[in-house]
Amino acid sequence: MAVFTQITTEQLTDWLTPLNLGRLVEFKGIASGIENSNFFVTLDRDGQRTDYVLTIFEVLTAQQLPFYLELMQHLASKDLPVPRPFASTDGALFRPLAGKPAALVSKLAGADTTTPTPTHCASVGRVLAQMHLAGRDFKSAQPNLRGLDWCLMMESQVAAFLPDHIADLLRDELMVQQDFAQTEIYHALPRGAGPCDF
């Protein structure tokens, strides 16, 4: 389950107050995910209920978060289907909750799937292309925290969940990527923000 940090109703109610989005109706942990604690949150504002997603960041630091949250804000402002972070009354996109940085974002329609179809893949490809185009004028930058070094570090953890023949394919591909990362072509590739953990 992807709830590593537990929170109380009282903690969340206090944390939500500076966002001025309404009264807490309910919240529940989200079972999927591998890195952060995530919760569905329902708020009521003048009789109108709205669903959100709360993320408590377990790994990313307060210094790393602005890049990601500002990128999400940038892409959402261009009408891409990405979660939109909500700022508190002082403009902060994240604040501490249970001793860790946390952010509230819009809840997107849809659900995850463990059996993607070619249609799903085509939809993802379209949105990724739109994201890359929309991100060209995003000015912030930061090192790729989900680049090749991270992939190499995660390989053994991921391989533990894979059949042997698939784990072998993963290892082989990472070797190809390591070799490619040493080439002039790789170093000449354009740089920009992207969903590198995808």
Give the ranges of each region predicted by the language model:
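An alpha-helical support segment within catalytic cores of ATP-dependent transferases
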Residues: T8-P18, K139-A141, L152-D197
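ATP-binding pocket architecture of kinase catalytic cores
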Residues: D44-S140
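Regulatory N- and C-terminal appendages and interdomain linkers associated
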Residues: M1-K28
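Short N-terminal amphipathic alpha-helix/helix-capping patch enriched in small hydrophobics
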Residues: T8, L12, I34-S37, Y68
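Proline- and acidic/polar-enriched loop/turn elements at helix boundaries
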Residues: K28-G29, A87-S88, P143
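Active-site acidic catalytic loop and adjacent metal/ATP-binding pocket
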Residues: A31-L54, P85-F86, Q178-F198
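Terminal low-complexity/disordered tails
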Residues: R146-L148
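Short secondary-structure capping/turn segments at boundaries of alpha-helices and beta-strands
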Residues: V25-K28, S37-F40, M72
